[in-house]
């Protein structure tokens, strides 16, 4: 019975992986190459570790499930972008435009959100803010708070 359950679980996992849209290879290459204005790009599931999109326009981009560990994202426009399940640990989102962005399930350990307005972000939780850090200029939705970066 256990073997049957494992086979069923593997089949469901394979189906889910097949259904998930893969990142656009050309868009990922643009990010890695430093050509970073990428409005509406499909970067879902991409490895974007240690890349930099500082002060560029990526509004409406799909970062769902991407690994953006240590990514330099400060001052960039991510309005309307999706970061569902994205690894943002160590990323620098200082002063980024996240108006209407979706951070549902994003991991934000030691993520800098200094000076960032998060009041219109979707899916933001206190647990995410507890793992991140900001400053006096960081704006969070009512009832939430963020620690100051040291």
Explain the meaning of each model-derived region.
Residues 1-7:
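Sec-dependent signal peptide recognition
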Residues 13-17:
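N-terminal signal peptide c-region/cleavage motif recognized by signal peptidases
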Residues 18-150:
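Tandem repeat scaffolds
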